[in-house]
């Protein structure tokens, strides 16, 4: 047994690095077992070892050299596409094609591949004796054919460049000349015809931007709670899953890369990543639909409103059975939003078993340990045929088992629709934490391998979605599309009309903990909204939901009626409706809601719980340019994460305390960083380079009533408090006295117009 263990341990050996001009390779040696026939006659006849009975074969081992490129110039990375298979780096082509947009364009890669390495008849090829032989040309031709076949199959969207499709035309011209009649040529020709047809249909208005658009001539009818109650819960969950699955399967995985997704706020990129935007829009529409149906009209009785809440809880449970984590999270987020959760009388009328079910569903998205629960569920059930549900409530357990048994009896297999924000968060954090280039200006390809691990999960789940056997129910989809969605102001105002705030003029409202964040904000990657940490109690928010059409704004709560740049999901601060529900509020207060981008440990928790400002605020913070991290990180060192100091690095979040200061920026901090350097980098992230750095101070938020002012001469890594959230404020030094006065005026009450995230209720300060 000991010898066997030693053999396994030594089967792969790290051999070190090989450095060539323009490239660095990592080399490992792997022992590979080979089955051979025991007698010479069988070996001479070419009989394979696995075709012989036991006892007629012998096992032999050979050492296989695996060489994987760690970093290189663009030319070397493209050249490695041709040689990777010979180096036993079998995943390189897929990794490169999925991530190369982070350092090159399709045109650059195609020109290098075809003009430099694919020109088998040019003078360069004739001068190179090693490539001029027919055998060498055949090897290169086969390698290029395999690369192009994979490119056209896996990443066809790279060639969508209407109206002329220059890269696809160049590729097709090359294939007609070098590989006439080949499979890649047929694929390229079919793809060009498909793109051209779609382009014509789009110009003629025949191509809908949404898969679920209604015909214009259909008479619109206003939906409401009365009509909503006519749909069965399993039908609603199934239709939501159908819509989510269709949208998720259309997501272009490489658009989730942090280097691409973080650029969507630029004006020239307003149409960037439309498939991701469509998924976000569906999420936000569902949250607003939940809010609208629960609030309904003022005439609804408390019991009727409670039944609508109960129905949505049951629908969320059905989504859990269908493994639709996107709609599940949207429904939970909406029910936890301020406009709904403040309805104490309605929640008090919800049956206890449904409240316990709601608590269990909320716990799925707890941000404890970097959302470990939801991640484990996704890993466990991502490609499984059925959900695996355990409930502490006996009635819920019985109901769930009946539903699952019915699915098994009918032979129905379920796919999985993930919460995309988790992946978006992970990829954004990877992009922030890992450098794009290493010493010598070489492209850091180890970073791309890490990114591909996340991309591969997305692709795997997209394939799993094909297991769903569902069709559209036009009646429900039409009702869903026709919903009169309420803005934040409207939903909160209606909520207050339904149930007036208790003693709002005499006592300050009880602070609540943030539970979830709106989807579009979670997708903002490193641009994070303050108040997102579950351990901090925040002042009261006024509303949830909005009516935006795009998601280019990061304002926590857009307060204007014309949300031209705000596509926002639910805001979810919680207030315990009554004492029986206090346990629910506390146990699920760490819940959050968004897809994804999930790195290590608690690294992504920073992106999960931004809060919303009251709707009376008139300032929408702007998204600033992404700042690429160039701090040195090697593949042998744990990447820095938020709220955790790994060796000598960590990630902190810094906001600017001013009228627009409700946006966090992630910054990687090392043990060598002094306060002035950190302030300078934070100012650069927030586009404040024109201001003198000496006018600002760095303040760590300890709690709602305590701050830690970092001295100008301090080493921030060691001066900060590592036992609390790594949240900092960049504050002008001459504004401290004014803010102290402001605190004294607002400490007794929290008016509805108080801006969330401005820390105006902080009472004390700690200085070193």
UniProtKB/Swiss-Prot annotation:
Keywords of the record, alphabetical order, are: Guanine-nucleotide releasing factor, Phosphoprotein
The record's section on InterPro entries has: RA_dom (IPR000159), Ras-like_GEF (IPR008937), Ras-like_Gua-exchang_fac_N (IPR000651), Ras_G-nucl-exch_fac_CS (IPR019804), Ras_GEF_dom_sf (IPR023578), RASGEF_cat_dom (IPR001895), RASGEF_cat_dom_sf (IPR036964), RGL1_RA (IPR030748)
Which stretches are tagged as biased composition: Polar residues?
597-621
| SUPFAM superfamilies, alphabetized | Ras GEF (SSF48366), Ubiquitin-like (SSF54236)
- Give the matching Gene3D superfamilies: Phosphatidylinositol 3-kinase Catalytic Subunit, Chain A, domain 1, Ras guanine-nucleotide exchange factors catalytic domain, Son of sevenless (SoS) protein Chain: S domain 1
- Biased composition regions of type Low complexity, renumbered to the chain: 541-561, 586-596
What biological-process GO terms show up in the record? small GTPase-mediated signal transduction
- Which positions carry Phosphoserine? 520
Region annotated Disordered, chain positions = 530-623
**Occurrences of domain N-terminal Ras-GEF (ranges):** 65-196
Instruction: Report the residue ranges that make up the Ras-associating domain in this protein.
Output: 648-735
Annotated ranges, domain Ras-GEF? 232-501
Q: Does the keyword Phosphoprotein apply?
A: yes
Q: Which Pfam families match?
A: RA, RasGEF, RasGEF_N
Share what the entry says about its subunit structure, partners included: Interacts with Ras.
Protein purpose: Probable guanine nucleotide exchange factor.
**What protein does this entry describe?**
Ral guanine nucleotide dissociation stimulator-like 1
Q: What is the lineage of its organism?
A: Eukaryota, Metazoa, Chordata, Craniata, Vertebrata
Gene giving rise to this polypeptide: Rgl1
